[in-house]
Amino acid sequence: ETAHGKLRMLEKGCFQDIDVALMMHGSPTTTVDVKSMAMSKFTVTFHGKKSHAALKPEAGRSALDALLLAFQAVEFLREHVPEDTRMHYTISQSPGPVNVVPDTAVGVFSLRSYSRQKLDGVVERFLKIIQGAALMSDVTFDIKEGDRLANKIPVLKLNDLLMENA
């Protein structure tokens, strides 16, 4: 799911002279699938200011607070996106002891939809969430976009031919 082999082949020019490609996955049954989700993946690093949480909490700016606010905002966004949208996230880094305001927090976000066009609209709103979380926490952020995948465009007639000859 995350190696994106066909994307790498496309980038290297493997499909230059090809009009149609048939994709196969091992399965105990013979089936055809007409769906594949578009995906945008982001790694977001919030940068705050470290401070002792008991002795001088007002001097700190919590990068982790910003990341948690972003997570919560994604939860609120779920009600306002197309039904087929999927949004996932995880904390990949937030070092330090619990009594120190963390100056770094890293989250990974995966946004998916069966429509690249619809997903692009969700991505716009997601980017505003990250900006807002940083603003609310008085921190800065870096964002790195990972692979940007298009949804598969099925050729239903080919699916029918495949099943007729399976």
Give, region by region, the residue ranges found by the protein language model.
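Histidine/acidic-residue-rich, glycine-tolerant segments that coordinate divalent metal ions
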Residues: 1-102
